[in-house]
């Protein structure tokens, strides 16, 4: 899929005083672009999200603060750092192989009951940790769960804390409609049980 020039203009360029070189586009959305980047010293690969600062004020700051608060859990995508680069902000994360949605739809090996249990336990453990730190994701869906590999025994990582909150009780509805709990759909006041 061809991308707009503003998306591809960073390919081959370095950021963070030459520490990271942007190599490929992983995806583009409404507010940002995610690239694969390599650490020029260690050779390690990372996912780097680029956001125009006009869009990164309050919401992106909140997202990164909440993500950083829970990033130490082994099943939460690791957030490494924020890079200020003039007009843009770059957010550096561990690089994963894909998302759970892709695994479920395209791969037959995900029909293994033991694998499903292991994945489910990893997700529940990550959410329990997030809740113990006062962070409520509110947009949990297969696309927001990244995977370590697209075959074999996989590890999963909860990602995308863009709708996360610290409010244990809330009456506002948010999330992806197909994945929202009935309580969210009916706009009743709900607590942390609904705020996965």
Which role fits each region the language model picked out?
Residues 86-94, 101-102:
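A conserved loop-to-beta-strand element in the N-lobe of protein kinase catalytic cores
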Residues 1-15, 23:
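Juxta-kinase regulatory segment immediately upstream of eukaryotic protein kinase catalytic domains
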